Amino acid sequence: LCAAQADIVQTVGSTSGLEISRAPGQDKFQAYALQTFSGEQVAAPMLEGCVAWLECRLLPEPGNHQQYDLFLAEVIAAQADARVFSDGRWHFEGHDELRTLHHVAGGHFLKIGDPVDGKILLV
């Protein structure tokens, strides 16, 4: 998700999917007219407007699922928006609205900031 999507992220994330699903044939994608496309490897909708997508295969771990509500997955495909990702790196300069969005709490988000390069220190 990117900074341009903060409002819809907050709205969809604050809405109960259970409440929406009580209407026949409704889910959050339909209720909020979220546009999707098909993944390359997994039969799951990929949300349009993001800057990256991961397709995953669930790793069955029933104990983790039941005891901790924890799900583990293996990434089997990845895509990224070429406007901000190339040569194995993110390049957000000039695309502030596409900076990745990170939820903090209570409707507050951070977007990824300026790059900082580290140097190897000699000891």
Which residues make up each language-model segment?
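Basic, polyanion-binding surface patches
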Residues: 1-123
